[in-house]
């Protein structure tokens, strides 16, 4: 062990390293001095014991990695979305035929939701499901309203907010119908359900978690 640590450089090794060759005693003295400076708190006996058994780690430290805080992407506010007109339907896209596939998807969605619409299916069950269902793609009609000009309007529901329905009619006209003071009908495979807009002033996401109470009569 000692001969390995204090091995003198050969002439070739000295030439390759561009250093002057030194004797074994000078090499030993250099190593001891270096170890003493590197391990000042270690006693000579402990240092000697370490040399006999294993290598001495002259310098060791761990680098603490800084935890980078993940920045959450900040979404646009409702006001910013309105200003950017993100939800506006472009005039060239306001075509009834363009949204017929959406209506077909909606009908299949309702069939799956109601476990198949059969002639003996209870209307109350369908009504309860529709109250919490996503209505985008449904064909809805205004049957009653305090504003006579709304009555009779029928189309595919494209957008729903807390207070309005936006529907596209067969005449390719986009209509904005307020929920307040209006009664709507939704037809699904022969089943007709009524929606009282005044009691339906919720966002679709909020409606799915709301418990609706059955009432005998509801005024506009």
UniProtKB/Swiss-Prot annotation:
Belongs to the eukaryotic/archaeal RNase P protein component 1 family. Keywords: Nucleus, Phosphoprotein, RNA-binding, tRNA processing. InterPro entries: RNase_P/MRP_Rpp29-subunit (IPR016848), RNase_P/MRP_Rpp29_sf (IPR036980), Rof/RNase_P-like (IPR023534), Rpp29/RNP1 (IPR002730). SMART domains: POP4. GO terms for biological process: rRNA processing; tRNA 5'-leader removal. Component of ribonuclease P, a ribonucleoprotein complex that generates mature tRNA molecules by cleaving their 5'-ends. The keyword tRNA processing applies. This is Ribonuclease P protein subunit p29. GO terms for cellular component: multimeric ribonuclease P complex; nucleolus; nucleoplasm; ribonuclease MRP complex; ribonuclease P complex. Component of nuclear RNase P and RNase MRP ribonucleoproteins. RNase P consists of a catalytic RNA moiety and 10 different protein chains; POP1, POP4, POP5, POP7, RPP14, RPP21, RPP25, RPP30, RPP38 and RPP40. Within the RNase P complex, POP1, POP7 and RPP25 form the 'finger' subcomplex, POP5, RPP14, RPP40 and homodimeric RPP30 form the 'palm' subcomplex, and RPP21, POP4 and RPP38 form the 'wrist' subcomplex. All subunits of the RNase P complex interact with the catalytic RNA. Several subunits of RNase P are also part of the RNase MRP complex. It comes from Homo sapiens. Signal peptide: none annotated. The modification Phosphoserine is found at residue 10. GO terms for molecular function: ribonuclease P activity; ribonuclease P RNA binding. It comes from the Eukaryota. It is found in: Nucleus, Nucleolus. Pfam families: RNase_P-MRP_p29 (PF01868).
């Amino acid at each position: 062990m000692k001969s390995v640590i204090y091995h003198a450089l050969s002439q070739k090794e000295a030439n390759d390293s561009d250093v002057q060759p030194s004797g074994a005693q000078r090499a030993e003295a250099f190593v001891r001095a270096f170890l003493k400076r590197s391990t000042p708190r270690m006693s000579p006996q402990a240092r000697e014991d370490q040399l006999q058994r294993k290598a001495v780690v002259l310098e060791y430290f761990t680098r603490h990695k800084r935890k980078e805080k993940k920045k959450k992407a900040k979404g646009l506010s409702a006001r910013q979305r309105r200003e950017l007109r993100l939800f506006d339907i472009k005039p060239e896209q306001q075509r009834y035929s363009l949204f017929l596939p959406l209506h077909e998807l909606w009908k299949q969605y309702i069939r799956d939701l109601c476990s198949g619409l059969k002639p003996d299916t209870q209307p109350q069950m369908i009504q309860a499901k529709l109250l919490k269902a996503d209505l985008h793609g449904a064909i809805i009609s205004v049957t009653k309203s305090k504003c006579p000009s709304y009555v009779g309007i029928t189309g595919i529901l494209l957008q729903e907010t807390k207070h309005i329905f936006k529907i596209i009619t067969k005449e390719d006209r986009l209509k904005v119908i307020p929920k307040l003071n209006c009664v709507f009908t939704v037809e699904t495979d022969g089943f007709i359900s009524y929606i009282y807009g005044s009691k339906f002033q919720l966002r679709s996401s909020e409606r799915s978690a709301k418990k609706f109470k059955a009432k005998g009569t509801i005024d506009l």
